[in-house]
Amino acid sequence: MKRIVLDASAVMAFFENRTGAEKVEELIGLAVQGKGELLMSVVNWGEVYYSIWRTKGEAAAKTALAEIAQLPIQIVLADFEVTKLAAEFKAQHKLPYADCFVAALTKLRRASLMATDRDFRAVARVISLQLI
């Protein structure tokens, strides 16, 4: 594992113990050992926050954010460069706009994207993709 960008779908799988949770847990363990780097776009971090809030309530959402803060995941802000590339992905591919941010971060950081969302197949020729 070198550098992995986690999509909201992968983080949600981890928190909800769904298919792929064990892979995310393995990556977290490797990052703790210093054997790789985990990144997440702040836009996708926000997706996790609102998704948990909608399904489990505000308290659960705030607890999840506190738990994410304890994990070896670097939350990357959406600066001009990331936002520009996200907009270009949106213009060229059938992909939700929030997903374009994680794709842009993946490309700019020369990383591999870990996701459960099959929509990312639309950009699989442009970025390294690992579907779980």
Sequence positions of predicted segments:
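Acidic, PIN/NYN-like endoribonuclease modules and their adjacent C-terminal/linker elements
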Residues: 1-3, 103-132
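Short beta->alpha linker loops
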Residues: 19, 43-44, 78-81, 101, ...
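A generic structural signal for short hydrophobic patches within well-formed alpha-helices
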Residues: 11-12, 45, 120-121
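Helix-loop "lid/cap" segments that line or gate small-molecule binding pockets
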Residues: 51-54, 72
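Anion (oxyanion) recognition and catalysis
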Residues: 32, 69, 107
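Active-site neighborhoods of divalent-metal-dependent phosphate/nucleic-acid chemistry enzymes
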Residues: 74-114
